[in-house]
Amino acid sequence: MKKLIVITLLAMMSMSAIAQEKINWMSIEEAEARCVEEPRMIFIDVYTDWCGWCKRMDKSTFANPVIAKYMNEHFYAVKLNAETSDTITFQGQQYVGYVREDGRQGTHRLARTLLNGRMSYPSYVIMNEEMRALQVIPGYQNEKAFEPMMHFFGDKVYLEMSSEDFLRDFKSELEPEEASDQKQ
């Protein structure tokens, strides 16, 4: 009986550890420094504080333990507030926060550069190990839509085949209830 209780407790503790997996977000400067030491792809979440869909990504897709585990193993994950007033140095260039003539906060120059001037929130920038942008993906992505996209880039499948061919044979690691959220 004691063995059963111990086994049950260990199982519950391991499940809660898996459920607590979170994405290790960092600044773009930190990701750049780490990429030099240990090359890895970079995933940049470009968001704003007022964006409802950005908050939903944080609470659903990014909170999914399967997504978080994969992101932590294959990417340096960056959060970039598109309206920060901070000066950010990236790839040897300084980008300053933009303040409009009326004194209100504008869009940060790095966010504008990364999104090619197409400001939409949330948007995600996938960069290779050389810190070159491969893809900009705009809009909210539920777990079911996000998972194959991160595998397509994280497993470097994009080098070998089209996304259409990849999606045809992709096998999800998400549980059916985790993948049930429909794209909005």
Regions found by a protein language model. Give the residues of each.
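C-terminal partner/receptor-binding element of secreted or periplasmic proteins
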Residues: 157-177
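Sec-dependent N-terminal signal peptides
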Residues: 4-19
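N-terminal "domain-start" segment that seeds a small globular fold
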Residues: 18-34
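Short active-site neighborhood of thiol/selenol oxidoreductases, capturing the structured segment around
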Residues: 38-52, 77
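Detector for the c-type heme attachment site
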Residues: 55-59
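Short, solvent-exposed mixed-charge patches
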Residues: 181-184
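Thioredoxin-like thiol-disulfide oxidoreductase module
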Residues: 28-33, 65-135, 143, 148-159
